[in-house]
Amino acid sequence: MITPEKRTLDEPEVGSESKKPNNSTHVKGVAAIKAEYLVPTSSLTVVEYDDDEAEGGDREGESKPRNKKKQKGQNHKRDLKQKKDIIKLCPSLIDPEDDRICQVGADKCRFHHDIASYLESKPQDIDGICPVFEALGYCPTGIKCRWLKSHYNPETSKLIKDGDKMETAKTTNYEVNHIDKDQKMEMQKKKYFFKISQPVIKYLDSRIQNEANLAKQKEERKDNEASYVEAPFTIAEKKKLYLRNAKIVSPLTTVGNLPYRRLMKTLGADVTYSEMALSVPLIQGHNPEWALPKAHVSEYPGFGVQIASSKHWAAAKAAEAIYRNTTHVSELNLNCGCPIDLLYKQGQGSALLDQPSKLLRILSGMNASSGDIPVTVKIRTGIKEGKNTAVNLVSRVLEEGNAAAITLHGRSRQQRYSKEADWNYIAEVGTVVKNWNEQQKEDKEGRDRDPVYFVGNGDVYSHEDWYEHVNTDGIDSVMVARGALIKPWIFEEVEAQQYLDKSSSERLDILGKFAKYAIEHWGSDEYGVGLSRRFMCEFLSFTHRYIPVGIMERLPPKLNERPPKWVGRNDLETLLASTDYKDWIKITEMFLGKATDDFQFTPKHKSNAYENK
């Protein structure tokens, strides 16, 4: 849980090894690993990572490349579909003791109704105790569970249930932000009444009339202002955010799923965000989009929902829909930083950086429609490399946007991850925010609202990075993205103010915890296990990049340094560092049982070789 007061930060005690002068020779851009762990090779065979994939690359509709070039970077044509049961059991029979009745009858039902033959057709149970039963005291997937023998009595043909554990789980272990089916159906049928955002949209529409009709525009604006209904909550009355020195995990597409975020909460994170949701599918009631605001109860308070939009009307409606249909949301975050071409061409994400008036209308619409949920924004330094625009943009957001917090990723859209984040520029923007906050304290009208938080983002991979930036004047906290994927215990290091040389068994335990959370979330049946395995492989596509600090020749480690081929201090450490996705599948089998022959997983990243010059 986040507390309003954070402890005073002292200068971290940096390990002596990071202060030692490095007299050894190493190749620039290549991680410095102790010689005894290097594998002799004539060239450096490494993996080229396209880390923009975590910022929206899995969204449907990604445009296909026009010309066929040598394939490298991310795999756009990955087959991500997971297989379901060959024989599909009728949902009414999942729990033999349940009184549910098949609505169409056994004769007409397209699902299987013979429990005995269904059980015979199932693959052999996975060894061990069902993670869901162990956590909740019962298993919602019933006899479809792949660990069925751990909670099924074949003599009585009944499921085993632990009443005490079930009662405890009701208050400590459950998921939140489930939208009501009827409300979602109304959105799908376009019958949902957006009572809060409708007058807001009408008012904002009046602000974008053609300037050629200025006189007419003024009259219309007067009419709209007369009919405009004030938002039920002013900025000062919205929920409070506590981001000063908070340990923040960045919004991440695909890998920033609920099990991962839940894992990060156990490893010290204060604030987590949903994967990016698109505003139009949200207000149309699309099931996949409404799965994104779901969270584990442990994430709240401190859970934010991130949305992307190119239209103020869509953003306002999405903000209202989230406010009225969720219960555990601490903030709404507008994505103005996603560099992916699909969103950019649609005017979403980083496209808004060059359209400040549109961005401000979207923020205004969200703020007026989001009830007591504060609105925040995440931006980049600009669109093009060398042409930073964040200072001017942030100045306007402070004056007109009513954002509760601003996060700046220290790269332009054009740069992507090709260069290191510009923390000098982040600090420059932080000074702008700090000065504005100080002016607000002197302003009578500004005294009623809380200061705007400013958060920096980019290349944070150690406690040294974190403290260096948090102790920079004007920067309230730091948001961590790739660093928290490759090294999930990064916030434990921040708390301890030292490097933690996690053993291979400790790292495996972290992966095991993710696997349990994944099964709890996606289910313990064949389909749920397949999904859990797929997302665990996605997670491993980042964790395998970790180089143990105990084998490094110099510290601190850098995210953009490529690792040469190396071996670990034991076989498990070597396995956890494998770049072969087949080894990732082997690791999942330690927790999820043997993968089926038809399990499909294609890594996002393709291998590339570099000459060691």
Curated annotation (Swiss-Prot):
FMN binds at residues 251-253, 306, 378, 409, 457-459, 481-482. It is found in: Cytoplasm; Nucleus. The active site is at 338 (proton donor). Disulfide bonds: none annotated. It is an enzyme of class 1 (oxidoreductase). It catalyses: 5,6-dihydrouridine(47) in tRNA + NAD(+) = uridine(47) in tRNA + NADH + H(+); 5,6-dihydrouridine(47) in tRNA + NADP(+) = uridine(47) in tRNA + NADPH + H(+); a 5,6-dihydrouridine in mRNA + NAD(+) = a uridine in mRNA + NADH + H(+); a 5,6-dihydrouridine in mRNA + NADP(+) = a uridine in mRNA + NADPH + H(+). PANTHER family: TRNA-DIHYDROURIDINE(47) SYNTHASE [NAD(P)(+)]-LIKE. Belongs to the Dus family. Dus3 subfamily. Residues 66-80 have a biased composition (Basic residues). It comes from the Eukaryota. PROSITE patterns: UPF0034. Its cofactor is FMN. Signal peptide: none annotated. One of its GO terms (molecular function) is flavin adenine dinucleotide binding. Pfam families: Dus. GO terms for cellular component: cytoplasm; nuclear periphery. Keywords: Cytoplasm, Flavoprotein, FMN, Metal-binding, mRNA processing, NAD, NADP, Nucleus, Oxidoreductase, Repeat, tRNA processing, Zinc, Zinc-finger. This is tRNA-dihydrouridine(47) synthase [NAD(P)(+)]. Residues 1-20, 56-65 have a biased composition (Basic and acidic residues). Gene3D superfamilies: Aldolase class I (3.20.20.70). Its EC number is 1.3.1.89, 1.3.1.-. Residues 1-29, 48-80 are annotated as: Disordered. The gene is DUS3. InterPro entries: Aldolase_TIM, DUS-like_FMN-bd, tRNA_hU_synthase_CS.
